[in-house]
């Protein structure tokens, strides 16, 4: 067996749901094998262009475009960009000679993993959602190993190569101290905290629904609302909202470990990483799936956690009719919240990143190029 350091090619892009799991896996690989040579492939105009270099890894640009379901005219250039991306990926794989290629989804993963497979490199895929995305569903047929976050995803990939290992999450989420977290949000020991968030950009539906029921929530004398509005909605909401000693409105929460540690209950979207963060932190939640995602995968995520007893699922269309009642009932029922928290932790896979990293290194050792 060769003694040279393993060479690993990572690819996953477009959104945080694809980018951050790739970074977490790379970090875990580096923790296990500090000598590992890890490089990323991705686009130059999406999240990975900023997040990957900030995490300390080199990013090799690949031209890529997904199928546009709304802006149909832009699909005219799709064949040319796919071909360009394949040529770039072929050259990249030839230059770095990876022992294994790891994909976490997003359309940029398609040309890179296809080029790696055509050059005889083993593929490992990580799927974050209960319903596997298009790129991963196609490439899973070529992969030697498929790591899943939800057991339901086994229905969409070759079962003989699949293992349920969870989504990689940040260690800082699990290290946060609840007392320090509550102090950071000025919440007393006996306060009940509702955490509201709709992603980094925000959710118009969740923000609007919370704004309409804010008065009855704060009428509960010990309820504190920590509200991440998202960048799109912060200015307008803060202009409309009156100040209140138990209301904390922020554009974005950098220390999410503190937010989860302080929360008694969350209301949020049902993206894959959010669901995984809820489970590893044991945070009961009301999940409001976004209707604007491919294959309605957030609803499938929400259903999975609701079936496990870890969350309550509400459609966007039902927020005005039911959100106030659901939130007040849960905030008033500590026993049910405790059961939901326990069910969430039962679904958690806190060692997901390390589990996947060990598999990456095992494949690299088995298929070392020289």
Swiss-Prot record:
It is found in: Cell inner membrane. Keywords: Cell cycle, Cell division, Cell inner membrane, Cell membrane, Cell shape, Cell wall biogenesis/degradation, Glycosyltransferase, Membrane, Peptidoglycan synthesis, Transferase. It is an enzyme of class 2 (transferase). The gene is murG. Its EC number is 2.4.1.227. SUPFAM superfamilies: UDP-Glycosyltransferase/glycogen phosphorylase. It comes from Salinibacter ruber (strain DSM 13855 / M31). This is UDP-N-acetylglucosamine--N-acetylmuramyl-(pentapeptide) pyrophosphoryl-undecaprenol N-acetylglucosamine transferase. Cell wall formation. Catalyzes the transfer of a GlcNAc subunit on undecaprenyl-pyrophosphoryl-MurNAc-pentapeptide (lipid intermediate I) to form undecaprenyl-pyrophosphoryl-MurNAc-(pentapeptide)GlcNAc (lipid intermediate II).
